[in-house]
Amino acid sequence: MSFDFETKISAKFMNEKAVVLNPKMQNILTERGFGELQNDALVLDSFETLYLLYNNKLELKKINKNIIFDELIQKYLQKDDDALTRFLLYRDLRTKGYVVKDGFGFGSDFRVYEKG
């Protein structure tokens, strides 16, 4: 999936998740199938966060310090040995134009939808 937005999204890293607080930036992402609205924030899954960082579309900060892709993937790998594999699968599906959401469990990592 190519990116049709020029704006770099700003997010805060809180509780191991990227959180987008700006409503305009939330709209940019939700229109493209990213994240889940929780109260007044858009929360991104780990694979969405990695994907946006990898494609240089996300500026992620924790206490005014930028977090880069390599740092974040290492953090996720400490808790989940399959984090890199999940990211690569997610990236492949998004690149092919699919909207990808977190799975429901029971051995399902993703839900995959055609865009539209």
Question: What does each of the following model-derived ranges do?
Answer:
Residues M1-G116:
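Long Lys/Arg-rich low-complexity intrinsically disordered regions in nucleic-acid-associated proteins
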